[in-house]
Amino acid sequence: MIAGLKGLKLPKDPRSSVTRTATDWAYAAGWMAVRALPEFAVRNAFDTGARYFARHGGPEQLRKNLARVLGVPPAAVPDPLMCASLESYGRYWREVFRLPTMNHRKLARQLDRVIGGLDHLDAALAAGLGAVLALPHSGNWDMAGMWLVQRHGTFTTVAERLKPESLYQRFIDYRESLGFEVLPLSGGERPPFEVLCERLRNNRVVCLMAERDLTRTGVEVDFFGEPTRMPVGPAKLAVETGAALLPTHCWFEGRGWGFQVYPALDCTSGDVAAITQALADRFAQNIAAHPADWHMLQPQWLADLSESRRAQLRSR
C-alpha cells in the first residue's frame, strides 16, 4: 500500500475531484518546498506543526491507539508522547520528501552500523527461497527500503491505488526512483499475489506493511488485548512458497534510525491465522518499545469502527 496514506477519506460530493486534485498539488508543493529549504528550517517547521496539532489533546484517534499500546484510558496518554508521536510522523514525511535527492550510498553506509538481525535475512536468501519482510507503519520504512536496494538490489512491494490517479502515480514514481518494484493492489496486468510468489521463487525479497487490514479479507487477531484484523498476505506467501517470514521493525534513534530484522516465524503448520497472530504479537512487542514512532492515525481496532462497518465484517 501507499505507506502512511491508507485510510485517507476524501469527500464524496461533486467537489471531490477538485479536492483530490488539490491534495495532489499539496503533495507536489510539499516535495518541492522541502527539497529547496535547508534541513534545519524544514525540521523546525515540521516540529512546530507537530506541537501545534498536539495542542488541546491532539488527534483523537491517535490518542485512542496509543492508549491501547500503553494499557491506559485515552485521557491518560501523556501529552509529551502525543507531541513526540506527531513529531515522528512529521519527520517521516520530511524524510520522504527529501530522500530522492539524498546520497543513498552514504546513507546506506551509515545504516550498516545500526541495522540488527541481518543474519536472518542473509540466511533466508542463502536458503534460496526468498524472504518476506513484514513491517508495521513505524519509523521510516522507506529509508529501510532504500538501504535494502543498496545492499540486496530491487525488492517488490504492493501499493494501494489512491485517487486521483496523478497522486497515486506520484508515489509510484517516488518509490521506483528509490529502486523499489511496486505492484498495484488492484488493476494490474496480473494479480499481485501471483507476481509476489514468482519473485520469492526467484529468491527475491518482498516487503509488506502488515498491521492493518480492516476489511473482509483480513484475519482477526488479538492485538494489545483487543481484536483487530491484519492482512493474511505475508503468511500466505510464506506458506505457498516456503519463503522465510521475517518480522521487521523501524524506529527513530535521536536524529538517526533504528532497524531490526527478527528470526523467521514458524510457518510449517500452514495455519495462516496462527502465523498472523504470531506476527501481531511480535509487532506489539516492538510498538510497545517505540510507541512514539508508530504512525497510526486511523482506526486500528474493530471497537473504533461504526456498528454498520462491524456488521459488514461479520457478514463475510
Curated annotation (Swiss-Prot):
Bilayer topology annotation: Peripheral membrane protein
Cited InterPro entries: LipA_acyltrans
Pathway noted in the entry: Phospholipid metabolism; phosphatidylinositol metabolism
Family indicated by similarity: Belongs to the LpxL/LpxM/LpxP family.
Organism: Mycobacterium tuberculosis (strain CDC 1551 / Oshkosh)
PANTHER family listed in its UniProt record: LIPID A BIOSYNTHESIS LAUROYL ACYLTRANSFERASE, PHOSPHATIDYLINOSITOL MANNOSIDE ACYLTRANSFERASE
Any single Gene Ontology cellular-component annotation: plasma membrane
Localization terms from the record: Cell inner membrane
EC numbers: 2.3.1.265
Keyword Metal-binding in record: no
Residues of the active site: 137, 211
CDD domains: LPLAT_LABLAT-like (cd07984)
UniProt-recorded Gene Ontology molecular function terms: acyltransferase activity
Keywords for this protein: Acyltransferase, Cell inner membrane, Cell membrane, Lipid biosynthesis, Lipid metabolism, Membrane, Phospholipid biosynthesis, Phospholipid metabolism, Transferase
Free-text function comment from the UniProt entry: Catalyzes the transfer of a palmitoyl moiety from palmitoyl-CoA to the 6-position of the mannose ring linked to the 2-position of myo-inositol in phosphatidyl-myo-inositol monomannoside (PIM1) or dimannoside (PIM2).
Positions that bind hexadecanoyl-CoA: 137, 175, 240
Matching Pfam families: Lip_A_acyltrans
Reaction catalysis annotation: a 2,6-O-bis(alpha-D-mannopyranosyl)-1-phosphatidyl-1D-myo-inositol + an acyl-CoA = a 2-O-(alpha-D-mannosyl)-6-O-(6-O-acyl-alpha-D-mannosyl)-1-phosphatidyl-1D-myo-inositol + CoA; a 1,2-diacyl-sn-glycero-3-phospho-[alpha-D-mannopyranosyl-(1<->6)-D-myo-inositol] + an acyl-CoA = a 1,2-diacyl-sn-glycero-3-phospho-[alpha-D-6-acyl-mannopyranosyl-(1<->6)-D-myo-inositol] + CoA
Lineage: Bacteria, Bacillati, Actinomycetota, Actinomycetes, Mycobacteriales
One Gene Ontology term from the biological process aspect of the record: glycolipid biosynthetic process
Record protein name field: Phosphatidylinositol mannoside acyltransferase
